[in-house]
């Protein structure tokens, strides 16, 4: 009887230990690590799980013919109020879908197409050469830096990429450093508040969450231009 009680106690302690390990949350000074969404990396920032980066294998989806209708990209670009001599950074440029639509509007300026995937930059370079476009330059960034010169950028565009930054604190600090003092950051993310937007939850972001994270990085929300079908068009400026 005594042995049975000891055995039962041992099993109970073991099960409690397993449960504790399964639910364990690791926290650093910046980020939290725990299991979450299947499409997330298990790393959290300010209550938001970071999503996996879409690989270059999805490049055809970026160039899909329905994209203008779904996202109204032409209106997004109008929202940026581009000037001919401006220097623009398209962060997470992917296939160059936005960069090549911006380039003709800054004919005296330049568009930096920044991505961490060399395959994406290779595709941009091929398009650039085939269309003889001279004011788009590719930049290989890293998970922590956009590798752009300090105070060189008038406007930054990030379309559905910020939520995939593995190191959002470091990346936004790098972007902020690259922006001119009066520069603007256009943060485009699928609206988490709108359940009708047919995108997975982890690939969406609410205005409240975006403002929370940008505020921590030293940015203020100037305005949220609410004229896109699925996305927020949030304009941030340095504090």
Tell what function each PLM region has.
Residues 8-16:
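Bacterial N-terminal signal peptides
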Residues 24-81, 87:
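Class I SAM-dependent transferase core
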Residues 146-155:
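A short acidic, Gly/Pro-enriched loop at the edge of an enzyme's catalytic core
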Residues 154-168:
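A short SAM/SAH-binding and catalytic strip from SAM-dependent methyltransferases
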Residues 223-239:
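Core SAM-dependent methyltransferase catalytic element
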Residues 169-184:
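A short glycine-rich, Lys/Arg-flanked "PGG" loop and its adjoining helix->strand segment in the class I
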Residues 186-211:
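Conserved class I S-adenosyl-L-methionine
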């Amino acid at each position: 009887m005594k042995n049975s009680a000891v055995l039962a106690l041992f099993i109970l302690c073991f099960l409690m230990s397993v449960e504790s390990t399964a639910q364990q949350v690791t926290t650093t000074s910046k980020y939290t690590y725990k299991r979450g969404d299947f499409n997330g990396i298990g790393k959290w920032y300010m209550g938001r799980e970071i999503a996996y980066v879409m690989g270059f294998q999805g490049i055809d989806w970026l160039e899909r013919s329905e994209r203008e209708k779904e996202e109204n990209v032409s209106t997004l670009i109008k929202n940026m109020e581009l000037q001919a001599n401006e220097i623009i950074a398209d962060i997470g440029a992917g296939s160059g879908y936005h960069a090549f639509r911006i380039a003709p509007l800054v004919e005296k300026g330049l568009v930096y197409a920044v991505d961490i995937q060399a395959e994406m930059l290779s595709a941009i370079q091929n398009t650039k050469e085939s269309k003889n476009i001279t004011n788009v330059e590719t930049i290989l960034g890293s998970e922590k830096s956009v590798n752009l010169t300090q105070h060189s950028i008038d406007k930054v565009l990030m379309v559905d990429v910020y939520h995939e930054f593995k190191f959002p604190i470091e990346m936004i600090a790098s972007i902020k450093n690259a922006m001119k003092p009066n520069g603007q950051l256009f943060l485009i993310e699928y609206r988490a508040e709108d359940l009708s937007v047919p995108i997975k939850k982890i690939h969406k972001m609410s205005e409240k969450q975006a403002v929370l994270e940008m505020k921590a990085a030293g940015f203020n929300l100037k305005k949220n231009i609410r004229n896109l079908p699925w996305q927020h068009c949030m304009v941030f400026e340095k504090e």
